[in-house]
Amino acid sequence: MNTKVKDLMITNIVTTVPHKSIQHVRDIMKTKKIHSVPIVNTDNEPVGIVTAKDLIKKFKDGTPVSQIMSKNIYTIPEYSDVYIAARMMRNKKIHHLLVTNEHKLVGILSSFDLLKLVENHRFVMKNPPTKTKKTSKRLRH
């Protein structure tokens, strides 16, 4: 399995900027039914991330997202192998990686995306190709 991050990442991502309000991010998550919102600068470079867990605490709705976002973000190039992403998530105990190309945000990869890959791989392994009569005859000779 030589799957790249690019093959699994979500590219249709919703982002926001640091000066937007926490309420804005809450509304995005609720409307889009997502659990994280990357925060980007004007050059579309990731500068933070807000997750649903960050929003559990009580904040005034007008508080800028820059005050609660995780600034210690983890990024991975889109052409990296998926096993590197999985190892990063496990070692850092995180559930989201921001995917970049030349420092620009191009996608997001979640632990759920990795689980889907494992599930699909297991399905393929449980359903190997069956032998046909021609294949069986060739094997005997």
What do the PLM-derived regions correspond to, one by one?
Residues 15-33, 40, 76-93, 99-101, ...:
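The conserved cystathionine-beta-synthase
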Residues 7, 21-24, 38, 51-55, ...:
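Histidine- and aromatic-rich ligand-binding microenvironments
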